């Protein structure tokens, strides 16, 4: 069944809510969980769901994303008609770049027309979750709908800024509304549903919608494309986390809408019973892995104190030499020097924490070198003068920062 489906992964957005982490990369390429990129979760879902024809629509500062796709996801055999292919704006529908999700699909209409697929699965490549798309496609076919969208309970953890869905007891969509600016402050009803950025279209119906559409960015496919056609087309909802197609018991979904959401999603991985279990063996998340030696701890060269880490994730190539790491996520090739202390922080690839430095509640970008004796995360006013500080006090030291 998935062999009859063409998959479009939307990965063109910058994702300004994650600035400054998205100053030099799109949201889909932001590191997550000690070794992954955000897009890996969507692509892993495609892999496990049997989807083998995947187009990744890219645009904003896409080099790092393209490199990651090349290095980590060149796993399909094109001789069998399988592919994961990045598609930057081709300007076939004029001389404009992608104006939004809908415009990105519109500009690649020719790829839909040349495909033999009967369905088009459209996925946002910027959220963290596990999902069996094959079951959604099966439900779509069984219902006879022109479009099926994945929905989740708005009371469930994740995001409060997704469009709201009204559905009847037969899962037929009756309405879609854009979220209000103050939606986070309004407690949702017990049965309130929200979209997830997962849509299965009949290709013929999608092409007819493109024929009728204008030239706007169509920022939300549900509100801008599906809602106007509810009177003439059958749209159904597919409940995420239901018994059908369940691949994980947690119903976890997070769109990383802000620095605080990103930080909490990462820190949640360190719980004894994490809301998202990266160690689930039957639905592993694939990514590119550099050829680095194992992480290790060694005594400090001067103090002789053993390097230690507690309740933390350490990626390959990381060395703690006489320092202390507590409740942290350290990506590859991180160095924590003699006497340095790192608490409740996320350190990207190649970060070096100098001797005697102390970091607390920080996100340190790739290749930043923290000087000896530096203190970050203890004086909010001082931190705001130098770095980005989130509403909840997470300090982000941007890429390329020099002390």
Give the location of each predicted region:
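Unchanged
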Residues: 1-270, 384-399
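Left-handed beta-helix
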Residues: 1-8, 204, 211-403
């Amino acid at each position: 069944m998935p062999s009859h489906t063409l998959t479009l992964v939307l990965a063109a957005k910058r994702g300004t809510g994650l600035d400054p982490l998205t100053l030099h990369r799109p949201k889909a390429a932001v590191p997550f969980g000690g070794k992954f990129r955000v897009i890996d979760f969507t692509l892993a879902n495609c892999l496990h769901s049997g989807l083998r024809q995947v187009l990744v629509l890219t645009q904003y500062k896409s080099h790092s994303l393209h490199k990651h796709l090349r290095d980590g996801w060149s796993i399909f055999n094109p001789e069998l008609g399988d592919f994961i292919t990045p598609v930057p704006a081709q300007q076939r529908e004029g001389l404009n770049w992608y104006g939004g999700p809908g415009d990105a699909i519109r500009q690649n209409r020719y790829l839909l027309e040349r495909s033999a697929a009967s369905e088009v699965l459209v996925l946002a490549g910027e959220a963290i979750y596990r999902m069996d798309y094959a079951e959604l496609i099966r439900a779509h076919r069984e219902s006879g709908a022109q479009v099926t969208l994945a929905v989740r309970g708005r009371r469930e953890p994740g995001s409060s800024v997704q469009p709201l869905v009204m559905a009847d007891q037969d899962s037929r969509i009756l309405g879609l509304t854009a979220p209000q600016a103050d939606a986070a402050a309004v407690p949702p009803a017990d049965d309130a549903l929200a979209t997830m950025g997962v849509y299965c279209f009949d290709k013929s119906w999608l092409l007819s919608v493109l024929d009728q559409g204008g030239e706007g960015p169509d920022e939300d496919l549900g509100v801008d494309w599906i809602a106007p056609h509810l009177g003439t087309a059958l749209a159904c909802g597919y409940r995420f986390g239901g018994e059908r197609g369940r691949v994980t018991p947690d119903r976890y979904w997070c769109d990383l809408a802000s620095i605080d959401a990103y930080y909490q999603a990462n820190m949640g991985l360190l719980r004894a019973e994490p809301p998202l279990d990266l160690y689930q063996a039957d639905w592993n998340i694939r990514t590119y892995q550099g050829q680095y030696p194992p992480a290790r701890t060694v005594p400090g060269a001067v103090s002789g104190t053993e390097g230690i880490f507690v309740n933390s994730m350490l990626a390959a190539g990381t060395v703690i030499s006489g320092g202390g790491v507590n409740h942290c996520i350290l990506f590859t090739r991180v160095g924590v020097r003699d006497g340095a202390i790192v608490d409740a922080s996320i350190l990207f690839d190649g970060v070096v924490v100098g001797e005697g430095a102390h970091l607390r509640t920080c996100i340190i970008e790739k290749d930043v070198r923290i000087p000896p004796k530096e203190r970050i995360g203890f004086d909010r006013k001082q931190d705001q003068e130098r770095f980005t500080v989130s509403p909840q006090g997470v300090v982000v030291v941007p890429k390329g920062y020099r002390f």
